[in-house]
UniProtKB/Swiss-Prot annotation:
Organism whose genome encodes this protein: Pleurastrum terricola (Filamentous green alga)
Pfam families: Ribosomal_S14 (PF00253)
Entry keywords, A to Z: Chloroplast, Plastid, Ribonucleoprotein, Ribosomal protein, RNA-binding, rRNA-binding
Gene that produces this protein: rps14
InterPro entries, per the entry: Ribosomal_uS14, Ribosomal_uS14_bac/plastid, Ribosomal_uS14_CS
Entry's localization field: Plastid, Chloroplast
Matches recorded under PROSITE patterns: RIBOSOMAL_S14 (PS00527)
HAMAP family: Ribosomal_uS14_1
Name assigned to this protein: Small ribosomal subunit protein uS14c
CC per GO annotation: chloroplast; small ribosomal subunit
PANTHER family on file: 30S RIBOSOMAL PROTEIN S14, SMALL RIBOSOMAL SUBUNIT PROTEIN US14M
NCBIfam families in UniProt: PRK08881.1 (NF006477)
Amino acid sequence: MAKKSMIEREKKRQRLVIKYAQKRQQLKTELKTTSFLEQKVNLNRKLQQLPRNSFPVRLHNRCLITGRPKGYLRDFGLSRHVLREMAHECLLPGVTKSSW
């Protein structure tokens, strides 16, 4: 189980990404359309002044239940350990143990 502080930090980053997504997209489109160097510098400066944690690159996928950052499966939003346990308990519809 991940520390509560790490899980909360990640949630805060997700909120910031959502909050500043529209503003970031607007600045980036303006930056692409302008041809004046001075305007580009100003727009780039505004883009850099956004909070550091509002950049989507800083997000890290974590398990919804345990908060584990490694062994994360995107399709389920769970780590491999939790996925295995839930599949054995038949809590995931359509997931079956493979046999060949």
